[in-house]
Amino acid sequence: MKFFIDTANLEEIKKANELGILAGVTTNPSLVAKENVPFHDRLREITSIVSGSVSAEVISTDAEGMIEEGEELAKIAPNITIKVPMTKEGLKAVKVFSEKGIKTNVTLIFTANQALLAARAGATYVSPFLGRLDDIGHNGFELISTIADIFNIHGIDTEIIAASIRHPLHVTEAALRGAHIATVPYKVLMQLFNHPLTDQGIEKFLADWNRQK
């Protein structure tokens, strides 16, 4: 499973990229709004740092508007992926983008049927939301398993991005259930590195080494 970072913050992206584990970035209008910078300018900055997929979301609700926005976003850099909501209008736009060779990430996926429809429309990625399903008492892990099974049975190449990740367990389970990618907030990404026994082990090794010098 690959790691994307879910942020529009440049410092977080730079720090994650330096770790050598980052395969891409996902953004959304809420994340970009927090940064208080022009959307296109921030995307140019991100794509200058990260060579992998950078998801940029359209805000139009009709297919024509999404296509117009998406085509402009795609001009920013070759690694821009157009993020489109899981709606009928969204999938109309996905079909057009697919025919033009523009990569897409269909977001706000909450059922396997939605994922299958998005894949058949030509989506490069689908993004089921784990945390938001948890919030309403549904099992997001089972959803990822089901989507992965369906895609495997039918030979579908669309990749599954586990999104709305809130804690390290979400990452582990997403990997076990067949997600190709986890898009993770910076805070959660940093938590993945930590375990008390790792810290204790390093301290002991250093103490032993210093004693014998």
UniProtKB/Swiss-Prot annotation:
Documented EC number(s): 2.2.1.2
Localization (cell): Cytoplasm
Pathway participation: Carbohydrate degradation; pentose phosphate pathway; D-glyceraldehyde 3-phosphate and beta-D-fructose 6-phosphate from D-ribose 5-phosphate and D-xylulose 5-phosphate (non-oxidative stage): step 2/3
Catalytic activity of the protein: D-sedoheptulose 7-phosphate + D-glyceraldehyde 3-phosphate = D-erythrose 4-phosphate + beta-D-fructose 6-phosphate
NCBIfam families (UniProt xref): fsa_talC_mipB
Active site: K83
UniProt keywords, alphabetically: Cytoplasm, Pentose shunt, Schiff base, Transferase
One Gene Ontology cellular component annotation held by this UniProt entry: cytoplasm
Protein name as it appears in the record: Probable transaldolase
Described purpose of this protein according to its UniProt entry: Transaldolase is important for the balance of metabolites in the pentose-phosphate pathway.
Biological process according to GO: carbohydrate metabolic process; pentose-phosphate shunt
HAMAP family in UniProt: Transaldolase_3b (MF_00494)
GO molecular function, one term: transaldolase activity
Record keyword DNA repair present: no
Taxonomy, superkingdom: Bacteria
Annotated family: Belongs to the transaldolase family. Type 3B subfamily.
Broad class of the protein's primary localization: cytoplasm
